[in-house]
């Protein structure tokens, strides 16, 4: 579960500190990760803490889910790549385990909409965050009647889809009184964090430019006025999500620094606190990497024992097994770079656009600028980095 009340408490602390700097705050907007959500009752109160998408409850219901609606039909209707973590499958799993939710839940809010609600008291469903749920029709950009009816998900749980940029209301009086600050507007911005990141990219060229938003996940894609919902796109694991301006982000959700983060966490538990920059330095000292992994393999999805998983993957594919920490990190970083390259080439093939430039953004490129050397060698295109946050 996500401890949303703790997270919201930290948001209020951040607002209070920003106000204390003496700079008048005019507005606030929220973006978060996708697919997760919360249930509200008829009084507008949380029924329980929101599930985390890494919860394993969905797996046991996948077979039943896809008997009701095929992956092909779901992708054609919503443009969203079928995945166990998707909102639509999470909701289906919830209803199998807790059928009473259909009766007691009055509203479902995605995470940024939930935080906006806690800030302003206004219920909303912003487009970019809704677009990753598997519940929207890809063409109309409104809720898909066929998905709701086929899966027997109550449509009453969701309000009208709104485009980003709408002022919801001023910060609630309860919060202004609690924090002893002046009110300011709460705006429904680009609620999906990747949509927000892509909106901030200062593209340096008018030529077709791909983006890579680097973090725990890496989102590799291209902005387009039209979605791609062919069976070839489905087979390539591409997805279509919304942009702030109503266009589409044709992208692949790939593993990002998750494996690196888990290696760092495991080593810290073993008594070695190694920074990201130090990990990159260790990798740079490896002169000849001869092994690669598929960073999107299910073996790497769950936390824990990540070094052993990297070594096992190399062993199972008859490759040299990395021994030192630097070799392990080098295998992971170069494998990520080649996964990015494959995705860019798939997008080129399916859209008919030749991508000349790639713009990398996000916190994942901040660990060490030299990290992008791996991407630069693998991607064979002009590479631009920044901003990061």
Predicted regions and their residues:
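Active-site core segments that coordinate phosphate-bearing ligands/cofactors
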Residues: 66-79, 89-122, 135-141, 145, ...
């Amino acid at each position: 579960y996500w401890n949303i009340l703790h997270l919201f408490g930290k948001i209020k602390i951040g607002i209070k500190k920003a106000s204390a700097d003496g700079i008048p705050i005019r507005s606030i907007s929220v973006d978060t990760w996708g697919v997760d959500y919360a249930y509200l009752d008829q009084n507008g109160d949380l029924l329980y803490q929101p599930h985390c998408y890494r919860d394993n409850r969905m797996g046991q219901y996948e077979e039943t889910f896809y008997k009701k609606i095929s992956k092909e039909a779901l992708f054609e209707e919503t443009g969203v790549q079928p995945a166990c973590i998707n909102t639509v499958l999470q909701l289906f799993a919830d209803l199998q385990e807790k059928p009473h939710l259909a009766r007691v839940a009055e509203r479902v809010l995605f995470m940024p909409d939930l935080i906006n609600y806690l800030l302003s008291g206004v219920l909303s469903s912003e487009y970019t965050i809704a677009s990753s749920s598997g519940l929207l029709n890809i063409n109309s950009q409104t809720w898909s009647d066929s998905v709701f009816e086929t899966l027997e998900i109550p449509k009453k749980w969701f309000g009208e889809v709104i485009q980003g940029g709408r002022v919801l209301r001023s910060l609630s009086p309860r919060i202004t009184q609690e924090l002893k600050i002046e009110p300011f507007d709460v705006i429904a911005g680009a609620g999906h964090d990747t949509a927000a990141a892509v909106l901030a990219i200062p593209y340096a060229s008018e030529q077709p430019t791909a983006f890579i938003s680097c973090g725990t996940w890496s989102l590799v894609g291209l902005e387009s006025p039209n979605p791609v919902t062919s069976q070839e796109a489905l087979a390539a694991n591409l997805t279509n999500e919304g942009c702030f301006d109503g266009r589409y982000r044709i992208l692949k959700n790939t593993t990002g620094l998750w494996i690196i983060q888990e290696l760092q966490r495991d080593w810290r538990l073993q008594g070695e606190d190694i920074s990201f920059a130090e990990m990159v330095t260790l990798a740079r000292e490896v002169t000849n990497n001869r092994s690669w992994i598929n960073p999107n393999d299910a073996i790497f999805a769950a936390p824990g024992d990540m070094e052993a998983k990297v070594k096992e993957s190399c062993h199972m594919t008859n490759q040299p097994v990395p021994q030192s920490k630097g070799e392990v990190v080098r295998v992971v970083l170069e494998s990520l770079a080649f996964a990015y390259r494959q995705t860019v080439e798939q997008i080129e093939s399916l859209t008919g656009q030749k991508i000349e430039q790639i713009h990398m953004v996000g916190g994942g490129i901040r660990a060490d600028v030299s990290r992008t050397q791996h991407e630069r060698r693998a991607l064979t295109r002009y590479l631009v980095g920044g901003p990061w946050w």
